[in-house]
Amino acid sequence: FPTRRSSDLWWKPYDEKFRHPLYSFSKSLTATAIGFAEQEGILSLDEKIVDIFPDLLPENPSENLKKITLHHLLIMGCGHETEIMDNSENWISTFLHHPVLHEPGTFYKYNTAGTNMLAAVLRKKTGQNVTEFLKSRLLEPLGITSLTCALLGDGTELGGGGMKMVTEDMAKFTYFLSRQGEWEGKQLLRKDWFERACRKQIETEGDSEGHVKDWAQGYGYQCWMCRYPGSFRADGAYGQFGVVFPDLDLIVILTTATEQTQEELSALQEELIPYVKKEAGELPPSPLAGAVKARTADLALPPRRGTRNPFMEEKVSKHVYVSAPLMGNQQLPDSAEILIGGSGLFSLETSPIQEMRFSFGSDKMYWEVQEGGKEKEFVLSMRRGFAYSEADGHIYAGSAAWRTLNTLEMEIRRMDGLSGGRMIVRFQKENLLLEAEDTLISVGGLGISPRQALTVFGIKKD
């Protein structure tokens, strides 16, 4: 990775080895795949989508639909006034049947389905999904090994928001953008692609109060312009950013779980960037540097606070708890809303928890769950920090503590997920009450409310 780095840091239990959900940061990778395809003559940005998917068109295509090109999809200007919400196997047909109320190229509307259409076009023309197509062209030359992507119902990759990768690989890709396609002396993707992709192609609108100033600076080919002159970014929901400052020869990678993303970008551009000098030379020794290094080395999310409770630990370990609907009481809520490990923008489904049991060791507790017919065990630290465990192909970090005599608090975070799940377990005589919520603090910025649930479990009778 041919560059100097100022700092890199993570808040424990997260660290550099875990993939992070990119959300719409994925769009910049999908656009780059289109750039390579254009370079190789596989496609032209002037091609019309009606010519690429003739068998999926409505019976009488509108004149506006006939005008949509790949260029229009890249700039979020296909003419849709609303976005389709269809991940089924027929989603391409749904997109092509959606009303095109505006002439393409004249109206901006953020449209993840439009980016998915770019992924579908690439697959139609090459037989390869985005990540496979990029493997030899981008990923291997840059040494990117962690990229994965979720699939839509027809097997097309969710190029508009389904990718994950580690922070280091996000930095490599963002650095590639900053170098306009050059890597270690070789021009992998021609410079003129980035001259189009990384500059404003269409006007965008913020809100009337100016709270989202960095979303009102214009849009390129699946990347956003920033307020700082000449800067641009790959941008994913909840604060997944790869920001490029060309005149400072600087990139900044941010992975967060917040809805206050404008505040995040404002802090970067107003509190940090003014103090960055491209030709600063060797800085004199500073005692503050050591203090900052020590502080960042100890960054950690706070674990659950409380105490041990030997009496209740022994008591509850003797029982298996079964969800109330399975006990025949359909008036009580089931556990389908409980998201162990936290929710995400594209994974809001879960299965009801049928059974659970608790056991306790010297410094950890073990929560065994039967969910959707599968048995899982989560390990939670009852001392300092978090304990790691693996379940269902994912790594989880857990922390637990007794809040009161009969109330146990647990927090479980999926390491390749966005946030975490916090659960309050209140043990009663013959049952327990489980209250669950997402750790993501919602301020309504994305119109998505983190999940909350309340359900009852009873002691399983022999």
What are these regions (language model features)?
Residues P21, F25, E40-C78, H97, ...:
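Active-site helix/loop module of the DD-peptidase/beta-lactamase fold
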Residues E195-L254:
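Active-site Gly/Thr loop motif
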Residues G236-P303:
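Structured C-terminal helix/loop/strand segments within mature extracytoplasmic catalytic/sensor domains
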Residues C78-L151:
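A small/polar active-site loop signature that marks catalytic segments
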Residues F1-S6:
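Short, small-residue-biased leader/transition segments that mark boundaries at the very start
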Residues M117-V121, G161-E182, Q240-A257:
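Active-site-proximal alpha-helical segments within enzyme catalytic domains
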Residues P287-D462:
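Peripheral terminal and inter-domain segments
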Residues H20-D46, L73, L118-L122, M170-L177:
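Active-site SXXK
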